[in-house]
């Protein structure tokens, strides 16, 4: 068991160098970017993988009847660039498209411009996963993406983006305006499936990893596998952006099944391909072993009764796993993965008494400051910790000061500018000294907000996009209001509103006892009638309820009743 007071693998003060654009970062972080530069790799005689065109790879398998495209990236522009690259190598006609998982399906329309009836294959769960991230939890998901993938960070200077772990950027700036070209798969599977595609035998094996709909794709005639299991960095059991639990045991099964294929070539959803049975076998073995190590040791420590803060200090990967970049902490860090494994298995309570009924914020911070001897003593301790590169302690102390008062939006995040700067400095200390792209990007994004260089408030409110709402029936979007209900406004209201869409469809929503639930149209005493297009405009903040009523594009059974009902929701356009 490791008994060090610090967890050196998460960040190592004093290990900072300057990158090519003036970025301050760990040398391994800067070195990792070289693996992610745009390169079209030839994989055997019949396949190519384009790395560095975007966050993910676009890969191509040539069969007797044409070219199979695997993953289409974030947007049509990304896929169009990939097509241009592959056309330098082969003129084979497009024969099919396959999705490895739902993250990289946004550029498919670019393929249909070349072949309108292109067959598309993918897991049956892709659509549900896409829908899951676009509705109720959208602000939290978006904010997580902004932090993890450096979306608001500068491109140059000490705080400049180096990479995002699995790629050099979330979206390649050359691909603006990032046109969404997702097309659903028409050939789906949810279990092992065999097919003939482009004249090649193809086998699909569901293999959940960072997505429940991931699949390993095996081309037995080519001895080639395409996967989303083995990444160019230690697997992210925990994603700092916020994700559901990824059970390492499920991932390990997928890796073991993939290893049994005995591939000569291995293409990933991210990073350079691997070739040679021996190298692939060793990388696959070490990858699954690194993940099992984290799971096994977390369980061992939990069984012994250690709290989470003890467990993270007790578990570090053996030095052996630093031999190859695929098991290095270039994306996330072990101590965060350990926390996720523990909470995934046992929930948030780690048997530390202090966590059972903690004093809520901001009162907790106020009590800690008082107990420490007051603001000046806390500030002096922070400054001493910063001088000693003790960034863990500096962050904890500075967070007391920043979170000791509520801001105008009600969050405990209103500390004095000088204290926000102290916290920003401590976070930068971590960011410049970690191998983890996730940690660097999260810490710098927060530091830039703390010191006033950026404003992230727009990511803390629901900002519905009309084009996203319009992709589904209007009746579905009414249900999204559930998570915007303000109980203090609803009070003891028990009322049902029926929304009638003049171009087809209607839905009822009931407010009762502080919740909004699906309603029964027979119980609706209040009605709102309008075209779905105008409803989408209201949800997206392009049209207010009052303006819709004044312009006559919305009609009600009683204006005041509808206004009173919709005022209960935290959406400005429904309150004005």
Region annotations inferred by a language model:
Residues 65-66, 77-122:
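Active-site metal-binding motif and surrounding structural segment of the metallo-beta-lactamase
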Residues 2-30, 138-142, 151-159, 163-175, ...:
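Accessory terminal helices/loops
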Residues 66-68, 74-76, 131-206, 250-262, ...:
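Metallo-beta-lactamase
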